């Protein structure tokens, strides 16, 4: 059986994935808020969890710092900083421990020259450049579609770069979560119930990246389908 998807089918698939992503994102925020109220049995703050994880992995040149916002936590390989939102940095709860350990997972990847993180870091400025101009070329492409397909094809090439970036992000995020979960369990940062909650939250976080990659891919295929159909006509 052959499955033939046209650009309309791909459009609805993209919209469907978008709404599923919104639901998952809301569930993630809800769980983070819920687990933020659950006191951690070990009594450690997110900052203490992060510092301990870095030290036990022999990483002493990475700083743990506090930043503003909600779910703004990230690791910066350029400045070598684990940036934790204020609630995570000071929090003594399951959510804070899970998020802090996850971001330290990225620092460990950097320290061990994890190939996918290395590639993603190289691609970050390229992706930023592509993202800056892709909307312009895609809009221009649709405006000029009856005159020339070149602007739209350039937009598609730029969009392909950002799509590739979303897929490169998947192994990076999944590996960081696995490192985090293994470490917090082995080092008794969490008890059994807390571990299940941490795993649940990190799974939802990973799902947001999977859905983002799928949405980007289906939109890319839709744009390619539009160009191909114009060429056939």
What are these model-derived regions, one by one?
Residues 1-3, 143-149, 231:
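Membrane-interfacial hairpin junctions
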Residues 126-177:
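Hydrophobic transmembrane alpha-helical segments that form the core helix bundle
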Residues 14, 134, 148, 155, ...:
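Hydrophobic alpha-helical transmembrane segments of integral membrane proteins
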Residues 2-4, 26-130, 164-233:
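Polar-ligand-bearing catalytic/cofactor-coordination segments
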Residues 1-31, 141, 153-154:
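Hydrophobic alpha-helical transmembrane segments of small proteolipidic membrane proteins, enriched
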Residues 13, 24, 49, 144, ...:
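Short, flexible micro-motifs
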């Amino acid at each position: 059986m052959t499955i033939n998807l046209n650009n309309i089918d791909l459009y609805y698939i993209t919209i469907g994935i978008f709404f599923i992503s919104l639901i998952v994102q809301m569930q993630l925020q809800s769980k983070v808020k819920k687990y933020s109220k659950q006191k951690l049995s070990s009594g450690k703050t997110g900052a203490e969890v992060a510092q301990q994880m870095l030290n036990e992995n022999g990483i002493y040149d990475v700083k743990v710092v506090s930043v503003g916002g909600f779910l703004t936590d990230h690791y910066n390989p350029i400045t070598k900083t684990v940036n934790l939102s204020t609630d995570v940095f000071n929090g003594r709860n399951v959510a804070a421990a899970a998020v802090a350990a996850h971001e330290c997972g990225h620092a460990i990847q950097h320290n061990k020259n994890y190939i996918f993180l290395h590639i993603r870091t190289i691609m970050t400025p390229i992706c930023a450049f592509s993202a800056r101009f892709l909307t312009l070329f895609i809009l221009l492409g649709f405006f000029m579609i009856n005159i020339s397909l070149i602007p739209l094809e350039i937009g598609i090439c730029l969009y392909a770069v950002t799509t590739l970036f979303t897929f490169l992000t998947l192994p990076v995020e999944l590996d960081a979560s696995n490192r985090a979960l293994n470490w917090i369990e082995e080092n008794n940062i969490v008890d059994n119930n807390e571990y299940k909650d941490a795993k649940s939250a990190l799974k939802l976080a990973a799902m947001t990246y999977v859905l983002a990659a799928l949405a980007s891919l289906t939109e890319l295929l839709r744009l390619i389908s539009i160009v191909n159909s114009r060429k056939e006509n």
